[in-house]
């Protein structure tokens, strides 16, 4: 699920739909997630193309932070501080559980690490990340989990330098 969400985000960054590291759970992102899912996973008897699970659970990765709907005003009032993530930043599953409506009500957006987002601005880095995500997590491995996703994301600045 996380690889599919990242591929959808990469596509929307490339098409200039996503222009900043604040990733909202928009209809366009949901649609793109489903398109990517169908392309690589097809119809699965085990999994369904549910964007809410990776959108929520990616907060356990060091590059993804959920921002609560009520946190936005406090963040705007506070002084600008560097992007950082603490365990205290982890959010609880919203009332209504895993539904797009519940996620939208609970979270204003997910914030991607600025460094990672900057890397995604590079066409070659996007292409390389796509290949890695597809080959490692989506090709003939429908049930493989992503234990090394954080390491992969932290290596992206090096990939961008090579590209």
Regions found by a protein language model. Give the residues of each.
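Mixed-charge, low-complexity interaction segments
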Residues: 1-162
